[in-house]
């Protein structure tokens, strides 16, 4: 299982990668492994401003549906268009091509309050 050190993580198993004032968000390798084969990603919050810990969409696997939670507050700028036709990218490349949304962060401090890779690894080891 991969947990890239350059990313930040939430207790809800989302990751965040900051690139300038845009933050890419997806689910962790651990989360995709627990969910199993992803068949659909449903995000209808594009253009909305959401608070941290608010639901921004859902992800559907063969046997379950799970809410997707905002790790930071901000405006949902874009949903990954590739997931419409290839939701399995979340399984095969969760930290790259399988990103789910781009967000304009409302507060830079939110990003700093997320878990480091080491802290996230401790969380999932429990």
Curated annotation (Swiss-Prot):
GO biological process, one term: glycine decarboxylation via glycine cleavage system
Cited function: The glycine cleavage system catalyzes the degradation of glycine. The H protein shuttles the methylamine group of glycine from the P protein to the T protein.
Presence of keyword DNA repair: no
InterPro entries referenced in this protein's UniProt entry, alphabetically: 2-oxoA_DH_lipoyl-BS, Biotin_lipoyl, GCV_H, GCV_H/Fam206, GCV_H_sub, Single_hybrid_motif
Subunit structure: The glycine cleavage system is composed of four proteins: P, T, L and H.
GO terms for cellular component: cytosol; glycine cleavage complex
Residues found modified as N6-lipoyllysine: 63
Residue ranges of coiled coil: none
Domain Lipoyl-binding: 22-104
Record flagged with keyword Manganese: no
Taxonomy of the source species: Bacteria, Pseudomonadati, Bacteroidota, Bacteroidia, Bacteroidales
Cofactor: how and how many bound: Binds 1 lipoyl cofactor covalently.
This protein's name: Glycine cleavage system H protein
Co-factor requirement: (R)-lipoate
Family statement: Belongs to the GcvH family.
Entry-linked Pfam families: GCV_H
Alphabetized UniProt keyword annotations: Lipoyl
């Amino acid at each position: 299982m991969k947990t890239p050190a350059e990313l930040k993580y939430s207790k809800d198993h989302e990751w965040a990668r900051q690139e300038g004032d845009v933050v890419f968000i997806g689910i962790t390798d651990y989360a995709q492994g627990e969910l199993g084969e992803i068949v659909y990603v449903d995000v209808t919050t594009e253009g909305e401003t959401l608070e941290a810990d608010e639901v921004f969409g859902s992800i559907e696997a063969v046997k379950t549906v799970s809410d997707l939670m905002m790790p930071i507050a901000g405006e949902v700028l874009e949903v990954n268009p590739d997931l419409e036709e290839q939701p399995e990218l979340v399984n095969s490349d969760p930290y790259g091509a399988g990103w789910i949304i781009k967000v304009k962060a409302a507060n830079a401090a939110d990003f700093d309050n997320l878990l480091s890779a080491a802290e996230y690894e401790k969380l999932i080891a429990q």
